[in-house]
Amino acid sequence: MNNAVTKIAKENLADLVTFAPRERFEPTDPIFKILPETQTVICLGFRVLRGIYRGTEEGTTYYQYTTMGVENMEETIMPMAQLRVAAFLEEKGFLALPQRRHQQIMAEPNSTNPEVAYDAVYRGKSAEVQLDFENTAVKCGLGGKGLSGAILTSDFGPFVRYCFILTTAKLKPTPLQTPYLCDGCQECVKACPGKAISKNGTRDPWQCAVYYNGANGTKNPFMPPDAFADLPDRTSIITGNKHLTPEQARKVLNEIYFYPPAQHAYQCSICGRACDTACYIHLEQNGLLKRKFKKPFRTREPWQFCADDFKTE
């Protein structure tokens, strides 16, 4: 059965397929609230093309990451693979329940999802039970958790998205991966254009949202010189040195009109997941990734603009 599931998933563009038995999860885990009869959690991992990140690296094209690396993955490619695998399992007489990220539904009352417009998020919806995606991925043997919280895989590093299927079928488990990729190098922390990741790996979702959307002018080719002219501390905002409260973050986000959003409320990533890119480069430089390329990802010093370009006086 494992081989058949893996074959169907890979025929539908999944790159990694792993399995976790129910015994790996605590009795209070959300999977048992969603489907109490769950016997196996299937994890489907999908590479985000390395080339998609090149646009931000070169400062030449940004829409490709958001549309091809996020929106189409989450809304088209990944659900199709889930549905095909789930249909196969149900044809065999087992229940199968796909689980994808709820990009616009949150249990937290005052958090946000940087990938979507903050005013499109429905907060405080605790009645909608959701998986802890990162911990579930680890328990499925997909990879290990990095300092920033990203799942790191030996094939693609952090350049991966993933989803799950809960099923009543008992399938052979994938061994847990011994964490070895993250060495605590802090490259993800240093790379964030808004200092949204602390040294211990805690991520501020509102700070992340502001700079994911491009509030750091030194890394945003679309920002006009008079951006945020009516906001206090605009220079600190533009250079990524201003720590923003959720209320302040909303005000900044209301003034970010640098680039059009995609469908389904997905915001264009101007930072291009700088944290993940820095992590990938570090893993590649240290020879820790299985998949090799003819040239290294980074071939020269990263570009940036001067903060003086945004002076209004």
Question: Which ranges hold each PLM region?
Answer:
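Flexible, active-site-proximal loop/turn residues at the rims of small-molecule/cofactor binding pockets
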Residues: 23, 48, 171, 198, ...
